A protein has these predicted regions:
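Non-catalytic accessory segments flanking enzymatic or RNA/DNA-binding domains
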Residues: 1-218
């Protein structure tokens, strides 16, 4: 059996993963279960068959291309949308070529709203070259509890990561998704070594904003 893209569901969480067969999918889901302590009871809400491993990886790359500009600190993307709209986006990505990527991205951009909650907040996390797409109602609760000026800070942070080429390579992706304790110094050191002073300044500002945000939410 060729690789498949699985869309998995557990409570309010959604993930995608590429698996060689159902047995691989079970193993991957087990690792997710262990990590997030969600217990058993996974439900596959969709399985997208592909004709080859290369095609599966290409589809995963397309998904990443569309959603990557929204990745921010702690793996949270502020896209509010309905589950139906989210799955429709995946379907569009499957049938798209590179020329239509920007159109899909533009559609998503118009769909999400920071102040009027009418869908879910989705996130993507990169781990060992596998990307999980998901949503969490806990972040919605936190977001809605923020004051307007605090939301504006977070919006400003999103604008940083949507600007120009800031999310084009893995180091910058890590900068957006890093764990403060484990990776921040390593990422900052890398950015300094490659001489990207503007990116370094932006990352410092993002770190300041989100450390403050985390304190307010705890």
């Amino acid at each position: 059996m060729y690789n498949n893209l699985y869309i998995l569901h557990k409570d309010n969480y959604y993930w995608t993963c590429i698996g060689n067969d159902s047995e691989y999918s079970k193993k991957y889901r087990l690792s997710l279960t262990d990590r997030y302590e969600l217990g058993s009871g996974w439900v596959e809400i969709g399985m997208i068959p592909t004709n080859s491993e290369a095609e599966a990886k290409e589809l995963q790359l397309k998904i990443n291309t569309v959603f990557k500009p929204f990745i921010i600190v702690n793996s949270v993307i502020l896209i509010t949308m309905t589950q139906e709209f989210f799955l429709n986006c995946i379907k569009q990505i499957m049938n798209s070529d590179n020329n239509s990527m920007l159109a899909i991205l533009d559609t998503i951009t118009r769909e999400y709203d920071y102040t009027k909650k009418y869908g879910d907040v989705y996130f993507i996390e990169c781990k060992n070259n596998k990307y999980k797409i998901g949503c969490t109602t806990d972040f919605v609760r936190r977001w809605n509890s923020l004051k307007n000026e605090e939301q504006n800070q977070a919006i400003y942070m999103i604008d940083i990561f949507k600007s120009n080429d800031i999310y084009l390579d893995e180091a910058r992706l890590q900068c957006a998704c890093y764990n403060y304790k484990d990776n921040s110094n390593k990422v900052m050191k890398y950015i300094q070594e490659v001489g990207n002073s503007e990116l370094y300044k932006k990352c410092i500002e993002v770190e300041r904003i989100w450390k403050d945000y985390d304190k307010r939410c705890k």
